[in-house]
Amino acid sequence: MDHENLMKYLEEFRSIRFQPDFQKVDAERNVRYCEITDFPISNISFELLETGVSQQWRNCDQNLFNEYLKTYKNGGYSQFEDLLFKIWGYSEEKERFDLPALKSFYRKMSEIVGEDEVLEKLARLVRITKSACEVLPEKIYRLVGDIESATFSHIQCASLIAWMFFSDTPRLSFIIILQKTTCVAVEKLKFLFTYFDKMSIDPPIGAVSFRKMRITHKQYLENWKLRETNLLPDVQVFDKMSIEETALCTQIDFANKRLGGGVLKGGAVQEEIRFMMCPEMMVAILLNDVTQDLEAISIVGAYVFSSYTGYSNTLKWAKITPKHSAQNNNSFRDQFGRLQTETVAIDAVRNAGTPLECLLNQLTTEKLTREVRKAAIGFLSAGDGFSKIPVVSGWWGCGAFRGNKPLKFLIQVIACGISDRPLQFCTFGDTELAKKCEEMMTLFRNNNVRTGQLFLIINSIGPPLNYSEQYVFDAIRAKINSTKA
């Protein structure tokens, strides 16, 4: 995203705020765990639900951390591993197991930066973990029931994430990563320790908000009726820009319904990479369980700590570069201390079978409606006033979930029409398909196709007899041209 566009969007943000806007929202439903200028820490009356975030740090023997920090310079790797097992509750040698990824990280990093520096990295993690009782409140509410959002300082996020090293609950910790034997697991530890180094030495000052966007089907229909006759949104297609290079916008996370996907396991595709670049996003895993069809998750203000190269099995950690750090500009913070970039997690339908069967499934009215509605819920998360602030997305649900790329592009065009926002669409190097997307938008503009009309056209094209990735584009083009004849 170039400097000129960033300055244009920054000017727009003088009069708008990503949600939660603490000047307007219900303070009891939108919980502030940190002090924000003019807005104190929330004082709420809800009883802590059984699904509140575990406060295991309050039951931990702090002497274990204190003893480690007294002697870590001489204790080597084995002392840190011993600390982990003691916190996990595996005091007996026979109960313990190998942590190959952690051992490999220690060995490889010792060869690069020296063993003393690696020991310092481990000690920084322990100090952040130890600080949890001081910086975190006694009650942390998950995003369930009446609770809509949670806002933490960057420092508080670090304490929560550090504790994920010392928890042995697989779904909420790094214990599976530590037991992996893959190169990707070692790279994930590089991302994490880069994060803890930064948070120990030069932490950003500000806050991050996590919000569950809920909408009823009735509310969705009201938005649909309001905007179905609108012209389609402005769409720009980029074959070289990636979503994470942008700022002052809404970036789309191609999410799993369990937020983070395989980030705490072996996964290393779009969602997992985003969470590794911005580890603060993992706090959302602690706050949310399974995202439902009428829900989306918004994260506002996450800081980017690392860059990367590769994808999936070839993922490599890289030192942060200007290309990926645009959103870290402190001049982009709002009055609540949040960086004004939003990441919205929306989960797609998972398809199975042959390519033809996958396409047929997606073209059913039920699945088409579900995907348009899910995307629209995410794109609507910012609220009113964002008609000039882009949604930046790409091939949502087109990898492991086997979505059809042309169809997913059009679904997101419709969703941006419903939410009255421009779309910046990244095709990740697929120049040919980028050109076809642009050609379709030209066709729509030349024929004054409206938001609701495009949905009806897609819903009426009928199933293909044989599979072609371009079937949806070809069928729509034929239908539009036939109406002109």
UniProtKB/Swiss-Prot annotation:
One of its GO terms (biological process) is ATP generation from poly-ADP-D-ribose. GO terms for molecular function: poly(ADP-ribose) glycohydrolase activity. Its main location: cytoplasm. Pfam families: PARG_cat_C, PARG_cat_N. It is found in: Cytoplasm. It catalyses: [(1''->2')-ADP-alpha-D-ribose](n) + H2O = [(1''->2')-ADP-alpha-D-ribose](n-1) + ADP-D-ribose. Keywords: Cytoplasm, DNA damage, Hydrolase. Expressed in head and tail neurons. InterPro entries: PARG_cat_C (IPR046372), PARG_helical (IPR048362), Poly_GlycHdrlase (IPR007724). Disruption phenotype: RNAi-mediated knockdown results in increased sensitivity to gamma irradiation. Changing residue 271 to N: No poly(ADP-ribose) glycohydrolase activity in vitro. Its EC number is 3.2.1.143. GO terms for cellular component: cytoplasm; nucleus. PANTHER family: POLY ADP-RIBOSE GLYCOHYDROLASE (PTHR12837), POLY(ADP-RIBOSE) GLYCOHYDROLASE (PTHR12837:SF15). Belongs to the poly(ADP-ribose) glycohydrolase family. Poly(ADP-ribose) synthesized after DNA damage is only present transiently and is rapidly degraded by poly(ADP-ribose) glycohydrolase. Poly(ADP-ribose) metabolism may be required for maintenance of the normal function of neuronal cells. This is Poly(ADP-ribose) glycohydrolase 2. The lineage of its organism: Eukaryota, Metazoa, Ecdysozoa, Nematoda, Chromadorea.
